[in-house]
């Protein structure tokens, strides 16, 4: 525990270098998961701030984000956010999947920050680093509380998730949508069961996610789909892509767009190590094609 505490303090000192990541000023305690959370550990922190500004150089279509958790039990082998755990002295592998940082004061911080005079009321994106509806949200209810606060403040927001747990919050999402623009997007990279089990072992079945898209739209919450990431040699077949796009359109998705896999430093090594075990026939091809984070332009 001492090493984690030390690295946490170091992260505070480096906050100015990456403001979207370092937002905790006190590591309070840790809780070992039991029952359905067996094998997990939750690091409770008080966040110094919770609404973070996206760096100006970023190409994403939003300026502000909220992430109530760090780390993610969805355990997607390609997750670009894995290296954020290294700043706390934790690993990008099992630590990222099993040692989850919980910003226990997130709801209170959102309430204070959206009430501040300097806050502009801009759109806020949730789910940009880790899933706001990952398993531990069922325990902590932080995302539910944040949705309530943003709705009451008439502040527009969007949610990106892979989790059907979002359906638990149809009531507060519908109430928020009465006062502000609310949008949701599901990430559904494939309907291929083998690929899903291989690359997203902690996520709900993709067919259940498609049904969640239907239920959100039926409830009046606009919900689109990101077919992401598209994995070369795994989920990029014409029939595979047609299957997932057709299912999402039939479910009433407001939009369907695809994003190709990219592998940042650190994530690349983690993903390739997994691939060498599960699909050694593809590992060498990925090593060649992903010498950099993105596929060559000629292959996209």
Task: Enumerate the language-model features and the residues they cover.
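Auxiliary Fe-S-binding modules of radical SAM enzymes
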Residues: 1-46, 52, 233-300
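Conserved Radical SAM active-site core
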Residues: 33-70, 77-185, 189-197, 206-215
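A structural motif
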Residues: 154-155, 221, 253
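Conserved strand-turn element in the central/C-terminal portion of the radical SAM core barrel
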Residues: 191-195, 200-202, 215-237, 261-263
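Internal, well-ordered alpha-helical scaffold/interface segments
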Residues: 207-214, 228, 239-242, 246
């Amino acid at each position: 525990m001492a090493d984690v505490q030390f690295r946490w303090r170091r992260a505070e000192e480096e906050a100015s270098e990456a403001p979207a990541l370092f937002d905790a000023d006190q590591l309070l305690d840790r809780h070992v998961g039991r029952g359905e959370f067996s094998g997990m550990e939750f690091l409770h922190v008080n966040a110094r701030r919770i609404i973070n500004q996206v760096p100006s150089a970023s190409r994403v279509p939003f300026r502000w984000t909220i992430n109530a958790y760090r780390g993610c039990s969805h355990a997607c082998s390609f997750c670009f956010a894995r290296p954020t755990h290294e700043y706390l002295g934790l690993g990008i592998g099992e630590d990222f999947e099993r040692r989850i940082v919980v910003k226990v004061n997130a709801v209170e911080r959102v309430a204070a920050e959206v009430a501040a005079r300097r806050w502009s009321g801009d759109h806020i994106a949730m789910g940009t680093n880790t899933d706001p509806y990952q398993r531990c949200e069922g325990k902590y209810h932080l995302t539910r509380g944040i949705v309530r606060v943003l709705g009451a403040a008439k502040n527009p927001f969007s949610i990106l998730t892979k989790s059907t747990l979002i359906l638990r919050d149809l009531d507060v999402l519908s109430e928020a949508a009465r006062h502000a623009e609310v949008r949701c997007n599901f990430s559904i990279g494939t309907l291929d069961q083998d690929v899903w089990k291989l690359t997203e072992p902690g996520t709900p079945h993709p067919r259940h996610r498609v049904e969640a898209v239907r239920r959100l739209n039926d409830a009046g919450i606009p919900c689109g789909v990101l077919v992401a990431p598209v994995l070369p040699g795994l989920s990029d077949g014409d029939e595979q892509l047609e299957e997932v796009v057709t299912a999402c359109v039939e479910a009433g998705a407001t939009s369907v767009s695809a994003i190709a896999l990219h592998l940042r430093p650190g994530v690349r090594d983690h993903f390739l190590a997994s691939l060498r075990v599960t699909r050694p026939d593809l590992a060498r091809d990925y090593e060649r094609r992903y010498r950099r984070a993105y596929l060559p332009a000629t292959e996209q």
